[in-house]
């Protein structure tokens, strides 16, 4: 899975967000998608399907370590999930089992580049290949609703097209319910499966709605 390119999504998927203006931010304007907006996007003739990114509503921190190499990092994190059908890894790996306390994770490939060519180089630490990343232990600490729990993270793939840390939908639904039961997850990003990515109607619709795509793959 590590050398197969993008573990996240196929070419006919577009990630849609709302344009954020400085004025809108100060005015407290929401950049999340309403149910009506999602329904309207689903109804467009160029759309095959729409899935919402679900954000984590609880605090997450992670420690990364490889004892043999003397590597130990710790950082705050933010998880997102999308429905399973949009994830391009074998589903036997993309499964959360509460009993094992192991969370499968897809990370942006540029995180690995950032570590190898920035952090590792400046501190004379060993560089890591994608294959080696499967040996890296992640200690995930989750906090919320008066609970603090520790899980293990297992990196199962990398994405070029996604700048977020992706976890299975089943895990996210369970975790938000247990660690943030009073909150409702509102998507600020949508994953749109289109019939033809070169269809100009997509660009027209996005401009009219003031939406944009991550990576500007409609330009």
Regions found by a protein language model. Name each.
Residues 2-76:
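Membrane-proximal extracellular/periplasmic loop immediately following the first transmembrane helix
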Residues 17-18, 81, 109, 215:
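Pocket-edge structural micro-motifs
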Residues 33, 49, 58-62, 87-90, ...:
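Basic-flanked hydrophobic alpha-helices used for secretion and membrane insertion
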Residues 65-72, 76, 84-99:
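Alpha-helical transmembrane helix bundles of large polytopic membrane transport and channel proteins
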Residues 76-80, 105-107:
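Short hydrophobic beta-strand that contains or immediately precedes a catalytic carboxylate
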Residues 212-218:
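Conserved short beta-strand edge segments in small beta-sheet-based binding/regulatory domains
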